[in-house]
Each structure stands twice: as C-alpha cells, then as structure tokens.
C-alpha cells in the first residue's frame, strides 16, 4: 500500500545528480505512479533529451515511474502569479502526456509533489496536491546542479553512470594508416591520467580474415570483401568500448564510431553516413598528419598510397561535422605538445555550461 496515487517530481536536472536520484527514489517508494518531469530551456547546454535518457537509465525498472521531458523557455520569477502559471501550464501539459500514455487521460492530476526546493509548497498548492519535502538542506547528498555545473570534475562522484558517460570529455585521435594515432593517444591518456580506448578496427580485421580462412585457408587481406555491415559493427563496438571505459571526466580514444564512416568510404568507395548516425560528439578530435611520418608495414596495412587522400578525407569530414578538431604535425614531441595544449582548451570548453534561465 502506497501513501500517494500519483506523485510529481519536477526540475531542470541540469545535470541529474545524486540528490535528484535520492528525491526520485523517495517519491517512487511512496507512490503508485511517479512522473518525473524534466523542464529545460533551449539556452541551456545539455539537451532535454539527454537528461531524460540519463534519468531513464538510472531508474529503469522502477514500478510506476515515467520520465518525460519538455521545453520551458519562460523566465523564473517566483513573485509573479502570471509567470507561475506559465510554468504550471507546461507542467500540467506534461502530466497530461503521462496520463495519455497510460491510456487514462482522466488520471493526469497528482496528489503529491516531492521536491527539495523552496518552490515546492507553491507548486503543490497550484496542483491541489500535498508537498513532500525531501532533504531540503541537502544533508544526505551535499550537491546541487549549480555546483556540478561550476565544477563537474570536483563533483564527478555525485553523477550516476549514464550521466558520466554522457558528460565525459572525449578526446579522439584519428588519422590515416601509420600516422601515429595509437602512439599519440596512449601518450595523451598517460599525461592526462585518463582511460585509453584502443581502436577496434584492427581486431575486427583480424577476426574477418580468420572467418574468411574458414572457407578458404589461403585467403589473404587483399581478398576480403567489406560490407556496410562490417563498418556498422565496427562503429557499434567502438562506441561500446568507449562508453564502457568511462570512469573519470576525461577519456582518450584511438578512433571512435564516427571514424568508421571514413574507413567505410575508403573500403566501399563512397560516403556512408549510415555507418554511425548517432556517434558521440567528442570534446576534441586530433588528426595526425601523414606528412613526415614514415609508413611502417606491420602485415596488416595496405594504404600507403592513400595516406594523403585519407588525411584529406578526415579533414573534410571533421570540418563538415562542425566539431572541435586540430591537425597535429611535426616531430612526435611537437605533436604531443600541440595535442596537450589543444586538450587543455577543449576540456575547459567542454565543461563550460550556459546559465539556466533565471
């Protein structure tokens, strides 16, 4: 038997943190149904869809709990009845969406509002519900969205797994064959004290050759038949490895899911954006120039004659994608210095959040 039939938990969740999760669990434990409503402004740095996804991941399987998000671009003014009603209009609309999803539009009303904020009393009053304060002094979880935005790295331990994966600053090193991507990415991970994610494409190639030899023991690298599915598999597995490796605020990757689209172009002879349509947008791409780097044949490489073309393909693709990137050139030491400088700037920029509407 629960205390309430339908509870509302409403906030920006910008970003979701341990205090938010404590609040949601408290509401769900005492309510038959719980609607978590994420209201985000378009001026804010984290899209509402991301916040909703992170909350859903953390609270998956909670009976009666639904997380919904919507846009609320109204200014905040707790002294204005008119402004209050603008926000409440959005909140009621989201509660209506929940009721429609449940197949019972008449069940939209709530009988409890769970919150840790001072506006909880007024919100509950306007909804004809009871306000249930949860840790308003933040003694159980001494964290706030403001604190996380001000210094995400210092508050990293207050973030759930899905939020960490989504917020992590990813540094991705890409480049043509034998241009030092693996060496540079390893060096960066060591210098930054960050996890390192190896390239999956090589492992897939080795496995593909082994599979081909199950049909023809004499099969060689040059005779492999590459398909779109191969590169979709590479992109998917590269993303899985990357997400699994996230622990701290920074991650260094030797290639990523998007890079698989460039290699698909190289082996299939045409652009294939469908290889990785939902690839992450890293904090920074580093493109290793082929100029000045001798080609080293390790038995698995076949693109010495295409290195300049591949460098241009990466350069064009990165520019078109509109992501932060930098070409690193010169000696190994020069490349490392350039990369470290670019990483410092990129990580600082990545963790700079727009202020919420006040």
Which residues fall in each region the model found?
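Glycine-rich phosphate-binding loop used to anchor ATP phosphates in small-molecule kinases
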Residues: 230-280, 295
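A structural motif corresponding to the C-terminal end of an alpha-helix
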Residues: 62, 108, 127-128, 246-248, ...
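Nucleotidyltransferase catalytic core that binds NTPs
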Residues: 1-169
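A glycine- and Lys/Arg-enriched "phosphate-lid" helix/loop adjacent to the NTP-binding pocket
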Residues: 148, 268-334, 347, 356-357
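Short loop/turn segments at strand-loop or loop-helix junctions that form parts
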Residues: 38-39, 69-73, 199-201, 255-257, ...
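Glycine-rich phosphate-binding P-loop
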Residues: 171-189
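Conserved substrate/cofactor phosphate-moiety recognition/catalytic segment
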Residues: 186, 190-243, 339
């Amino acid at each position: 038997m629960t205390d309430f039939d339908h509870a509302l938990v409403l906030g920006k969740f910008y970003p979701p943190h341990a205090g938010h999760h404590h609040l949601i669990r408290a509401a769900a434990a005492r309510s038959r149904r719980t609607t978590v409503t994420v209201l985000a402004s378009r001026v804010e740095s984290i899209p509402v869809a991301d916040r909703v996804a992170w909350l859903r991941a953390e609270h998956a399987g909670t009976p009666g709990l639904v997380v919904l998000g919507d846009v609320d671009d109204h200014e905040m003014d707790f002294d204005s009845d008119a402004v209050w009603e603008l926000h409440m209009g959005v909140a009621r609309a989201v509660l209506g969406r929940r009721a429609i999803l449940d197949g019972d539009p008449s069940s939209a009303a709530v009988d409890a509002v769970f919150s840790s904020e001072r506006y909880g009393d007024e919100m509950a009053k306007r909804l004809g519900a009871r306000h249930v304060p949860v840790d308003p002094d933040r003694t159980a979880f001494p964290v706030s969205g403001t604190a996380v935005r001000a210094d995400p790295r210092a508050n990293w331990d207050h973030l759930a797994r899905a939020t960490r994966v989504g917020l992590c600053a990813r540094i991705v090193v890409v480049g043509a064959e034998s241009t030092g991507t693996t060496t540079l990415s390893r060096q960066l991970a060591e210098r930054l004290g960050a996890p390192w994610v190896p390239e999956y494409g090589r492992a897939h190639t080795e496995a593909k050759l082994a599979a081909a030899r199950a049909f023809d023991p004499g099969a060689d690298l040059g005779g492999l038949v590459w398909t779109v599915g191969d590169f979709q598999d590479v992109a998917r597995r590269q993303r899985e490895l990357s997400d699994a490796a996230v622990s701290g605020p920074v991650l260094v990757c030797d290639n990523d899911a998007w890079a698989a689209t460039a290699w698909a172009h190289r082996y299939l002879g045409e652009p294939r954006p469908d290889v990785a349509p939902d690839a992450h947008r890293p904090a920074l791409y580093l493109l290793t120039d082929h100029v000045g780097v001798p080609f080293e044949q390790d038995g698995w490489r076949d693109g010495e004659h295409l290195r300049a073309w591949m460098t241009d393909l990466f350069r064009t693709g990165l520019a078109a994608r509109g992501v932060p990137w930098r070409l690193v050139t010169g000696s190994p030491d020069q490349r490392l210095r350039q990369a470290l400088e670019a990483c410092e700037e990129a990580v600082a920029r990545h963790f700079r959040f727009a202020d919420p509407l006040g």
